[in-house]
């Protein structure tokens, strides 16, 4: 029997191959990074170069689900569109029913459940996306969650998905500290530094979105990103000079 063709059948050694193939599709996607600060949540994604005549605004990897929640994804854009639309409808339905916005965990659990159903149904295939979902609950607590094609989800302080996830995660494990997220600017810089581990062409290929407590989602413009990149480069040079003086 061909176990890699059947979605709902386990192989003898316990694998669901279609789910594993979906996870491989995620690893080929653009890198996305999320960091939860003290008063801010930040998502950054690696922008792939677009065709000369293509409108850049139509190529978005970060999108709002509700006023207090937004997400970034890695993997198949068409699959992400379905998940995003379903999640937005659920956010609206929740608001109409209970007259309150969703919590970040609620909508993450909804997305994870949707993905899980597609690993157990005939005539369907798993969604080839992982998502970083961030936002604030009504009490002002910042949240960051990650879901994968199998339907699992976990809360994180900082995480990365996509093709450069391994090296970015190693960077975050090394550099994420309470001091590194002490201010909003430091949190934003941490995300940019993490992305610069895999993005070769500097700030022009980075897309960044921030949400502060009780404030709407803000997409940073290229000039703001370049300013942060310039500050990071300056700090690097100063640190190198200090090292040289010590030696």
Curated annotation (Swiss-Prot):
Disulfide bonds: none annotated. This is Proteasome subunit alpha type-7-B. SMART domains: Proteasome_A_N. Belongs to the peptidase T1A family. GO terms for cellular component: cytoplasm; nucleus; proteasome core complex; proteasome core complex, alpha-subunit complex. It comes from Xenopus laevis. The proteasome is a multicatalytic proteinase complex which is characterized by its ability to cleave peptides with Arg, Phe, Tyr, Leu, and Glu adjacent to the leaving group at neutral or slightly basic pH. The proteasome has an ATP-dependent proteolytic activity. Phosphorylated in G2 phase. The lineage of its organism: Eukaryota, Metazoa, Chordata, Craniata, Vertebrata. GO terms for biological process: proteasome-mediated ubiquitin-dependent protein catabolic process. PROSITE patterns: PROTEASOME_ALPHA_1, PROTEASOME_ALPHA_2. PANTHER family: PROTEASOME SUBUNIT ALPHA/BETA. It comes from the Eukaryota. NCBIfam families: PRK03996.1. The 26S proteasome consists of a 20S proteasome core and two 19S regulatory subunits. The 20S proteasome core is composed of 28 subunits that are arranged in four stacked rings, resulting in a barrel-shaped structure. The two end rings are each formed by seven alpha subunits, and the two central rings are each formed by seven beta subunits. The catalytic chamber with the active sites is on the inside of the barrel. Keywords: Cytoplasm, Nucleus, Phosphoprotein, Proteasome. It is found in: Cytoplasm; Nucleus.
